[in-house]
Amino acid sequence: MAANNMVNPAVDPALEDELFAKEVEEVKKWWSDSRWRQTKRPFTAEQIVSKRGNLKIEYASNAQAKKLWKILEDRFAKRDASYTYGCLEPTMVTQMAKYLDTVYVSGWQSSSTASSSDEPGPDLADYPYTTVPNKVGHLFMAQLFHDRKQRQERLSVPKDQREKLANIDYLRPIVADADTGHGGLTAVMKLTKLFIEKGAAGIHIEDQAPGTKKCGHMAGKVLVPIQEHINRLVAIRAQADIMGSDLLCIARTDAEAATLITTTIDPRDHAFILGCTNPDLEPLADLMMKAEAEGKTGAQLQAIEDDWLAKADLKRFDEAVLDVIAKGKFSNAKDLAAKYQAAVKGKQISNREARAIARQLLGQEIFFDWESPRTREGYYRLKGGCDCSINRAISYAPYCDAIWMESKLPDYAQAEEFAKGVHAVWPEQKLAYNLSPSFNWKTAMGRDDQETYIRRLAKLGYCWQFITLAGLHTTALISDQFAKAYSKIGMRAYGELVQEPEIDNGVDVVKHQKWSGATYVDELQKMVTGGVSSTAAMGKGVTEDQFH
């Protein structure tokens, strides 16, 4: 029988180690760049290289990430901002490229308009986790195509005539929504891998629990512990390092409006967890189970819970201590309160340590029970806010490139408080801001303030700002306006609302055949057929000649 010549030849271990050591040094050199001056990696270059395969793949994501980082570095240094909005589809991405230097891909928009299951829904991140990466790929492929199309057109014209032609940078870096990572750490890594493969320059990930994730402007948000979210950020960086990408990682916190947290395991969260300060109440979960056993339902159960919460007098532990001081018979109450606050404020100490400080100062135990108010699902109650968000952002900073605090309102004072709180510890930390369409901008501020809001935020270090759903809303607006007018005045509506404004404003899509790449494809065909084609799409008879 002939020998099997298909068996892989033996690898020389010495050469294998030599190549490994060389690649490790390359990674260490990469990490020594100023790009990573604030980045903390709890893993080694050896660990990263050992997770790579033998075939080195250069991802477009890396070039786009470097471009995005350069933009944000420049904006942050100048206290300026790159601002953009959520893009729906290729037409939109080509028009955005003329005026904006980044592109955003929203999970909310994808959930409602582009789920890979084709089933639309609200922003609960319950769509397949390929959904947003697929939208990134959709847009990035369009960017690449229109870049090729434009280059071909420019190079087909003599050099002295090219200044008359458009020279648009279609390759605007894309930042995309990774929600909560869609699962555990390996899910986060696989999601990151998809984003890099599809061409994303950056992604953001929030500190909500995956199973209960909500849009940032919905109620019922449940946070994960600080360390759990740090683990997600580390997972993103590790996966990007394995793939050799400078992918930007933006840490989002929903702590400003969150009311629940999964566990008390992380002491850095303890100061913001609510406890019952009424020792006469039985645990809420026990009370609710009894009520259900008695046959109570719906509104009756809600009334029982509301009554219990009203009696529980829920407080953060620090609030409970200060309340005891204020209501007690302490001759030096003001001094005690100041000493307690000085001992705990901003220290990220555990509840056990805070109790010991209070006991030493007051000579008594503080009744505070964070177990009894737990929800039926087992979640602990939390009092979020800007201070809670700052606390989390300070912990996330070494593991991400920018930080975003989701907020209820476009509140400049709150944005300033957050920025100052973060920059007091991490002065170089880049910040991001959601200019959300969930805000009622008319009631929030006057038109003059609306016009300057981005610039004012930029002065605080918010170097990347975005309207998450502007693509959705602008599409809805023109669709409603056109459909309404078309139903009444027919083709006059198309002429007045669409075609004439397209021509007047020089919108390239008015020549939609050319915009779609018909000329470019004709040139491909001619290249293959020796320069002649009787079936050229843009040949004699094309109706687009009417627009010359």
Curated annotation (Swiss-Prot):
Domain of life: Eukaryota
InterPro entries cross-referenced by the UniProt entry: Isocitrate_lyase, Isocitrate_lyase_ph_CS, Pyrv/PenolPyrv_kinase-like_dom, Pyrv_kinase-like_dom_sf
Signal peptide: none
Subcellular location: Glyoxysome
Keywords from the UniProt entry: Glyoxylate bypass, Glyoxysome, Lyase, Magnesium, Metal-binding, Peroxisome, Tricarboxylic acid cycle
Assembly and interaction partners: Homotetramer.
Gene Ontology terms, MF aspect: isocitrate lyase activity; metal ion binding; methylisocitrate lyase activity
Primary location: other
Species, as recorded: Neurospora crassa (strain ATCC 24698 / 74-OR23-1A / CBS 708.71 / DSM 1257 / FGSC 987)
Database matches in NCBIfam families: isocit_lyase
Entry protein name: Isocitrate lyase
Catalysis performed (reactions): D-threo-isocitrate = glyoxylate + succinate; (2S,3R)-3-hydroxybutane-1,2,3-tricarboxylate = pyruvate + succinate
